[in-house]
UniProtKB/Swiss-Prot annotation:
UniProt KW keywords: ATP-binding, Ligase, Nucleotide-binding, Protein biosynthesis
The protein's enzyme class: ligase
Annotated active site: 55 (charge relay system), 130 (charge relay system), 154 (acyl-ester intermediate)
Protein name, per record: Glutamyl-tRNA(Gln) amidotransferase subunit A
Organism for this UniProt entry: Methanococcus maripaludis (strain C7 / ATCC BAA-1331)
GO biological process: translation
Catalytic activity: L-glutamyl-tRNA(Gln) + L-glutamine + ATP + H2O = L-glutaminyl-tRNA(Gln) + L-glutamate + ADP + phosphate + H(+)
Subunit structure: Heterotrimer of A, B and C subunits.
Length: 431
């Protein structure tokens, strides 16, 4: 019975000390489970009875959509985002809203107004961010699967740290309608799951064109493909910036592709040093623009007075860069760099079907450990190129270091999501 499974998860959530959830409405989800059991029309849908957690920056009617900030602490969603409507239409149940870095501004899960999320795979370490609660909820078995958002690695980073699967679809594959955006030209919604097969199913369920999001695209259903004759690229610079212990685990993962019949191709990406400055300059400007609606008049509090340190830092830098005298000096140069980075990245896919490598360059730090902003941003160096270039990218578990999970990142060209998801599934089977 679905209601029994929901009750089991609710009990687990209640007992959990991971702090994965911000808002759970037991009465609401149990009532929805009872209604779902009577709904014969949904019984053959791919997500029938699946219990899904949703990141707190995606609108779900009747739940607190706080973005893990005091700014929106009292804001209750008045509608379902397009992805949530799609989940419900496929027979899924929403169990609650997950914790996250405040306004998705962070890579650790520690900047939330509601307190840090713990990493179920290594309880003394960060789970990664910003989709920290979604990843932790899946890793701690507090739901079947979860939805997160990825602006510069916010699905893939915590998936790697928590030892689960995460997938960032190509830009436009999934509607962003109902997402509280961080940086609209980078943001994409995607799945966090216990295995790669589920990532394929969940991506198919939430993707598709949406009139409410002009960037959204229609794509055929993603199917599993044979990858045995694929050329798999390994970028020297991605490996070079990575901690040796992680690199050793990733090299074992690359051998798995070789054993599957793939040809390994050595590649070079000369723009790796531009990745973080380009990403963050554009991010700051777009985030400053996105936060102007949080003025304390219509709903919530005035963001600059209510937000945490990292969010305020990004707003102030974004405001500074947006001023006319600095726009050309910083922002326009960042846009030019983005164009060059994208051209170079897309060129790599002329030599390879996929690019594989590490997800993060270092292991997650211990909870409460003080890192400078630049040390924190360094977690993103291998994930932001995906968002800058609008390509697709997934993460699967690839070993561990003293019990701390390591994730292998698989990248594909724009709209080659099917290839990446297929490779994730095959890697998992053969690892």
């Amino acid at each position: 019975m679905i209601t029994d499974r929901v009750s089991d998860y609710l009990e687990k959530i209640e007992k959990s000390d991971v702090n994965a959830f911000i808002d759970v409405n037991s009465e609401k989800v149990l009532k929805e489970a009872e209604e779902l059991e009577k709904n014969d029309a949904l019984k053959n849908k791919p997500l029938y009875g699946k219990i899904v957690a949703v990141k707190s920056n995606i609108n779900v009617k009747g739940y607190k959509i706080s973005c893990a900030s005091k700014t929106l602490d009292n804001y209750i969603g008045t509608y379902d985002a397009t992805v949530v409507k799609k989940l419900r239409s496929q027979g899924a149940l929403i169990v609650g809203m997950t914790n996250m870095d405040e306004f998705a501004s962070g890579s650790s899960g520690e900047t939330s107004y509601f307190g840090p999320t713990k990493n179920p795979a290594a309880m003394d370490r960060i789970p990664g961010g910003s989709s920290s609660g979604s990843a932790a909820a899946v890793a701690a078995d507090l739901c079947d699967m979860a939805i997160g958002s990825d602006t510069g690695g916010s699905i893939r980073n915590p998936a790697s740290h928590c030892g689960i699967v995460g997938f960032k679809p190509s830009y436009g594959v999934v509607s962003r309608q109902g997402l509280c955006d961080l940086a609209m030209s980078f943001d994409q919604i995607g799945p966090l799951t216990k295995n790669a097969e589920d990532a394929l199913v969940l991506t198919n369920a939430i993707k598709g064109i949406d009139r409410s999001d002009s960037t959204s695209l229609e794509t055929p259903k993603f199917e599993k493909k044979d990858i045995s004759n694929y050329k798999v690229g390994v970028v020297k610079e991605f490996m070079d910036v990575t901690d040796e212990k992680i690199r050793n685990e990733i090299e074992k993962g690359i051998e798995v592709f070789k054993d599957m019949g793939c040809k390994i191709v050595d590649l070079s990406y000369k723009y790796i040093d531009l990745a973080l400055p380009t990403y963050y300059l554009i991010n700051y400007v777009e985030f400053f623009s996105a936060t102007r609606k949080y003025d304390g008049r219509r709903y919530g509090e005035f963001i600059e007075e209510a937000c945490g340190e990292e969010v305020l830092r990004r707003i102030l830098i974004g405001k500074h860069i947006s001023e006319q005298e600095f726009s050309g000096k910083y922002y326009k140069k960042a846009l030019q760099a983005r164009k060059s980075m994208k051209k170079e990245m897309l060129g790599l896919f002329n030599s390879a079907d996929l690019i594989v490598g590490p997800t993060v360059p270092k292991l997650p730090h211990k909870l409460g450990e003080n890192l400078s902003p630049m040390e924190m941003y360094a977690y993103d160096v291998l994930t932001v190129p995906t968002n800058i270039c609008g390509i697709c990218s997934g993460v699967v578990r690839c070993g561990n270091i003293s019990g701390v999970p390591v994730g292998l990142q698989i990248q594909g060209a724009p709209l080659e999501d099917e290839k990446v998801l297929s490779a994730m599934i095959e890697f998992e089977k053969n690892y």
